Amino acid sequence: GALPWYHSFGLTLTLIASALHQSKLICILDPRAGKPPFSDILKAIQDYKVTLLHAVPAMYVALAYHPNVAKYDLSSLKACGAGAAALAPATAKVFEGETGATLFEGYGLTETSPLASADPSNKRQRKFGSVGFPMPDTIIKIVDVDTGKKEMKTGDDGEVAIHGPQVMKGYWNKPKETAAVMQTIGGKRYFLSGDIGHFDKEGYLVITDRKKDMINVSGLKAWPAEIEELLTEHPKIQMAAVIGIPREDDPGNETVKAYVVLAPGQTATEEEIMTWAKDKMAAYKRPKAVEFRDALPQSAVGKVLRRILRDEELAKMGEKWEPSG
């Protein structure tokens, strides 16, 4: 286990799950340890012949593109689980190619203990870019973002609403905050997740982004996660983060800026990335600025912290960030 146990993902799917299945748990206190970073976890997988690994997407990026990954015997790995943030299909494919393991993705929140949906266990039924199907006894609806009551059509984005035995009763001693995220639909109590997504024609759940992270480009909605996923398809890009920056000449509207971490040994220019993006995404989604970084700010569980990037940009402008949506 390489996830902190104070986070619901690490607590349930690493600590509790290993106890329930009576399996040996190899505890990695710091997955970044080693020279170069993340070498110790690769060595632990090899030495202890680890068969199951749960991690966040940022960790899979680090392992998949590790400069010495080919030197380790990772053949014991059979299955790996990803969650807590969006997993780029390009990362999953590189990781599976390097290890031979099958990478499954799940979705949920602390408020849903944490799983709400997950990929089917049959690899052939897995679909990259989706988070599978609702868990047993769980109902997921896609509702409009304004009222949280109107169900959206298949394929249309809306807020993800979750009903099931794993949904929290509420926030401790915070009745107003609880009331704001709980909605009664068809006589059942649903949790409004704050995530935007849709069901595709085959019934797979696709998470688009967080509602609060929407970028307003002249009235059009641009979702950072979608743009980040497209950017990581570039052969030179290892990780990307996207934010909206307020336009000083057009109050209420934003422009798209991308922060990019290149794969080891790669070099690129802003113009090169922006030119490449012209053929990959609509004009309003394309980054108008690209900044190269050695690393992106991340939380303790590996989530990219877009808020820090926003704060850095807005500090230059002397403004305070407020969500568009």
Where are these regions (language model features)?
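Conserved ATP/PPi-binding loop(s) of AMP-dependent carboxylate-activating enzymes
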Residues: F133-D137, G148-M182, A222
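Glycine-centered tight turns that cap/initiate beta-strands
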Residues: N68, S76, G100, D137, ...
